[in-house]
Every structure is written in C-alpha cells, then in structure tokens.
C-alpha cells in the first residue's frame, strides 16, 4: 500500500550500482530508511534527495527498509559556513537519537523550525538551544 507524508532528508549513502539508502525524518512515522532506485547517473531523481531537503515522500513497504516511489522537494535549506556545520550536527542528532519508526511529530516540527531559523540568519546559538 502506497503511503505519503512530509519528510526531511537526514542522510544519503550509495547503495549498489545506481541506488541510494536514504534516512528520512517524517512527521507520522519518525525516522525511516528507504531505497531510492535510479539515484545516481543521469537521473534527475537524485537531485531532490539530498540532506536538508524537505518535501513529500511517497513510499511502500513496512519492513525496516522501505521502497521510495518518489520524493518531491518543497524546500531545500541552503546553509553556509558555521550554520552548515550546525545544520549537519542537527541532522546527525536526529539520525542517532530518534529510534526507527518512533512517531515524534514535535521533534519533526522543531527540526524544521530550527532549520528555517538558521537559514533566515537568526542567532545560531539561540536556534540550537531552542531545538
């Protein structure tokens, strides 16, 4: 059964010849990992699936590794310099501290809010403390 929900891309790593395993933080399912086929090469599909991408995830499967049907990027958080490193730290915290399939809508909302504030140029220390 196909499912759809908002998701933030946390981490991407190559898998086999042209695929990737992607860690997503979703509002309803928490952190989930999925296989994106046709990720590398000339495909435009891989361009949208990058860390700091927020969008709509469509997938199927209920195992620990879902099959991603599509990911439509609604917003890419463009971070630079120290803000980029802080953003990577935030994504790493989500990857390591949120259990797989653990529903955490407040954490998802806080992460998106923090990245939005960081992108807007608000004080970095305050953004991270609020998270």
List each language-model region with its residue ranges.
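Non-catalytic alpha-helical scaffolds and adjoining flexible linkers that form interface surfaces
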Residues: 1-131
